[in-house]
């Protein structure tokens, strides 16, 4: 079988049998793929520590007859993101970003935008402590890449301008609701004027905008609750990594 080279981030690594490992990668070339690393646990000589989550690597893979899994023949580390691995908060945020990326895309569908966003977010975590604004920017960017962006600049139900806020937010309706539509929707979430403005800046400016966006409480809490609800609505559940962030999140604002 012909071998091809892929550049990807390890989203998940699962032990298989006594000595093997199955890794899920988000790649620049093929989107999300899974690969079988034979003997990865028996000897570190072949793969070293390259198959750990959040590693950016270059991989040589091949198709395997009768299997959806690629065969992983060799890897080299492009970026190990070693600094983020020494801090629980950064690990938790990286784990959440990786799980979110894994759940939002289907196999073998190229997602250049999401791949580049994930690498940029891991770079930010490697460079310094987690910032709530950066995580919100990652969530918004990931939703954009998946075609699921919430409506924030106008009412998600009727399309009327919502102005500068405050507004109500509903995941099922698709985003912000104007004063006329909100009363007819139960259990909406509040978005103060400052929260709405911050989310719009992050939606437009991405991770670059997050560097100058404090997103301090209570805006940080409102933004987190709104995007968490929106993601849960589309994914059908709360991600395991999000639940872990909920446990340690008060220390991070994440």
Swiss-Prot record:
SUPFAM superfamilies, per database record: ArfGap/RecO-like zinc finger, Nucleic acid-binding proteins
Function: Involved in DNA repair and RecF pathway recombination.
UniProt xrefs under NCBIfam families: reco
GO biological process entries: DNA recombination; double-strand break repair
The species this protein was found in: Anaeromyxobacter sp. (strain K)
Pfam families in the record: RecO_C (PF02565), RecO_N (PF11967)
GO cellular component: bacterial nucleoid
Keywords of this entry: DNA damage, DNA recombination, DNA repair
Name of the protein in question: DNA repair protein RecO
Similarity section: Belongs to the RecO family.
Cited InterPro entries: ARFGAP/RecO (IPR037278), DNA_rep/recomb_RecO_N (IPR022572), NA-bd_OB-fold (IPR012340), RecO (IPR003717), RecO_C (IPR042242)
